[in-house]
């Protein structure tokens, strides 16, 4: 079979023979794409099927363009269109700009979908962290939907939060238990507007930071507590 390059199919229609041949030569996600995908789906990324579960695609939408570009590069062979700009006015009357992108549908994404999707709904299996979450997954989960607990610029609080409001209390307890057992993180469930979030205590900050540091990109440094400077990060 001839080796078809991505740039040969980027502007072709979905029924193009060449595009179908390009997709057929792709077999599975590489290990980085799989591990990062777990973290992204724990965050705000969607994994969806348009053909009743035969194939899946991943969909992304974020405010941070640099992060979007980074993720699209990570999934480069699966993303055929550049990120597109979205504008909307929120309930306060302010303009909100985000960037959207998606992969094409493919059976390679079924492995991720099988971990999360039950009856077309994103769910958390009780063994997800212990069996599948890696430091790379944790880093993308944090970059996607985590941050420091205290955004006061003078704060010395090193606590971290992972936003899990879209999951049930039971599912978040699964995640907390897994983070404690696998990574020895001192964390627990907090309630934010009647929804569960994961709070990682300051005493576990260095453990957490050392786990995710190899995978963080500089543009997401602002999410870290003030005790870690960009100079330290770039060393």
UniProtKB/Swiss-Prot annotation:
Q: Which InterPro entries match?
A: Chloro/Mito_RNA_Process, Homing_endonucl, LAGLIDADG_dom
Q: Which cofactor does it need?
A: Mg(2+)
A GO cellular component annotation in the UniProt record: mitochondrion
- Organism domain of life: Eukaryota
* The keyword Mitochondrion is annotated on this UniProt entry: yes
Q: Which GO terms describe its molecular function?
A: endonuclease activity
Function of the protein? Mitochondrial DNA endonuclease involved in intron homing. It introduces a specific double-strand break in the DNA of the 21S rRNA gene and thus mediates the insertion of an intron, containing its own coding sequence (group I intron), into an intronless gene. Specifically recognizes and cleaves the sequence 5'-TAGGGATAACAGGGTAAT-3'.
What name has this protein been given in UniProt?
Intron-encoded endonuclease I-SceI
The record lists the organism as Saccharomyces cerevisiae (strain ATCC 204508 / S288c) (Baker's yeast)
